């Protein structure tokens, strides 16, 4: 029986899963919005949100913890310089999951994962 077992395996071994979420969370912090499957998005939330909570207090110790989990110097820098101060007053819920249809190849349900309160990109269309 698998009662009270949390987390999805996603047809990967543990090292592959760990590397995948490490890369996905670094991409999320860099681009502030990524597209993935719904199952991966729900699992990514559990990886990314504690890192943002950690970044709310900037210290050498917290930076080292974040780097040990992300292994991406640029992502850790942005996490502590931009994202931590941005969510200083928010007690949680930094990630939003928006369902966006199905993937054409295998009909997998897809979703956008975005950071809440991210700056909106202005459209580049010229208004005539």
Curated annotation (Swiss-Prot):
Protein family according to the UniProt entry: Belongs to the bacterial ribosomal protein bL17 family.
Gene Ontology BP term (one): translation
Pfam families: Ribosomal_L17
UniProt cross-references to InterPro entries, sorted A to Z: Ribosomal_bL17, Ribosomal_bL17_CS, Ribosomal_bL17_sf
Keywords assigned by UniProt, alphabetized: Ribonucleoprotein, Ribosomal protein
Keyword Ribosomal protein in annotation: yes
Protein name: Large ribosomal subunit protein bL17
Quaternary structure and partners: Part of the 50S ribosomal subunit. Contacts protein L32.
GO CC terms in record: cytosolic large ribosomal subunit
UniProt superkingdom: Bacteria
């Amino acid at each position: 029986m698998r009662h009270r077992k949390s987390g999805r395996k996603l047809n990967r071994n543990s090292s592959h899963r760990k590397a995948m979420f490490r890369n996905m969370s670094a991409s999320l912090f860099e681009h502030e919005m990524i597209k993935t499957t719904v199952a991966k998005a729900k699992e990514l939330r559990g990886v990314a949100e504690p890192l943002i909570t950690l970044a709310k207090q900037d210290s050498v110790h917290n930076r080292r913890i974040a780097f040990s989990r992300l292994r991406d110097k640029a992502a850790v820098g942005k996490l502590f310089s931009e994202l931590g101060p941005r969510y200083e007053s928010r007690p949680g819920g930094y990630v939003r999951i928006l369902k966006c249809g199905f993937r054409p190849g295998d009909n997998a349900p897809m979703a956008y994962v975005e950071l809440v309160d991210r700056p909106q990109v202005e459209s580049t269309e010229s208004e005539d």
